[in-house]
From Swiss-Prot:
Enzyme class, broadest EC rank: hydrolase
Domain of life: Bacteria
Annotated organism of origin: Mycobacterium leprae (strain TN)
Name listed for the protein in its UniProt record: Inositol-1-monophosphatase
One MF term in the entry's GO annotations: inositol monophosphate 1-phosphatase activity
Family statement: Belongs to the inositol monophosphatase superfamily.
This protein's UniProt keywords: Hydrolase, Magnesium, Metal-binding
Length: 291
């Protein structure tokens, strides 16, 4: 069966279905591959990617393969960009109105390896390099966050479907701020120095370990704001849309060129967005962080 409709709501339904199925697969495969013990998993199931601290597991690659197989059945004419399997070099250069699916089979792989229950499957549909639908499925909790352009965001869990709205906070000093760190040692040091300057101007800071979940937490009002440098498109393609459709102010990197040009992502409740950007600007936090 194929689903040819490019309507955002139809694409959202596909994203939800794919993310939900993939999350169930990840849940089962973790127990099969790593057992039920918590703590870091080792052996041949884990290897390093960009740095020794940047892991990828056999479950990442298997899950992306599952997602690609399902999309080949449902959307055979669409392009696919996956964290593990690659895809179009420039998402803005695909033919007009072509749908590109942006996949992160496990966002939060370090958490996954250590048995920390903050990792998710992220599936987004983009047209001309802009997300129009997306879903983020929390593997352990079973929640599925989703959005479609212009149609709002919601979360589905054991209690049903709830509309997502970001927080109403209007004072940066009372904001709970999320952030994350790159894998490069040099970049991490610079990010830590920036965070040390940001910490006194907000209520407190959380580091969840999954950009997709950070953005969904902004959408749900569980974080008031989030910023992170060097975020890849597959990390934020679905979550940023979900946050924006929940009312957050979202700033994304300009991606005019080859994929891999990661950049700064900011999402904040509208009442503190300007103040957050001003604080980041004051500490030179809007500039790229390079090796």
């Amino acid at each position: 069966m194929t689903v040819p409709d490019n309507d955002p709501e139809q694409l959202r339904c596909v994203a939800e279905s794919l993310a939900t199925e993939a999350a169930a697969f990840v849940r089962c495969r973790r127990a099969e591959v790593f057992g039920t013990d918590l703590g870091a998993a080792g052996g041949g199931a884990v290897r390093a990617k960009s740095t020794p601290t940047d892991p990828v597991t056999v479950v990442d690659t298997e899950t992306e393969r599952l997602l690609r197989d399902r999309l080949a059945q449902l959307r055979p004419g669409d392009s696919i960009l996956g964290e593990e399997g690659g895809g179009p070099a420039d998402l803005t250069a695909t033919p007009a109105d072509t749908v590109t699916w942006v996949l992160d089979p496990i966002d939060g792989t370090v958490n996954f390896v250590y048995g920390i229950p903050a990792y998710a499957v992220s599936v987004a549909a983009q047209v001309d390099g802009v997300s129009v639908a997306g879903a983020v499925a929390e593997v352990v909790a079973g929640r599925v966050h989703s959005a479609a352009s212009g149609l709002g965001a919601h979360v589905t869990d054991e209690y049903g479907v709830q509309v997502l709205r970001c927080s109403a906070v209007d004072d940066l000093s009372m904001a709970l701020l999320g952030t994350g760190f790159a894998y490069s040692v040099v970049r991490r040091a610079a990010q830590a120095a920036l965070l040390a300057q940001m910490l006194p101007v907000v209520r407190d800071v959380r580091r969840i370990g999954s950009a997709a979940l950070d953005l969904c937490m902004v959408a749900a009002g569980q974080l008031d704001a989030y910023y992170e440098h060097e975020v890849q498109v597959w990390d934020c393609a679905a979550g940023a849309l979900i946050a924006a459709e929940a009312g957050a102010c979202v700033q994304l990197p300009k991606r005019n060129g080859p994929v891999g040009g990661a950049g700064l992502v900011v999402a904040a409740a509208p009442g503190i967005a300007d103040a957050l950007l001003a604080a980041l600007q004051r500490f030179n936090g809007l500039a790229p962080i390079l090796d």
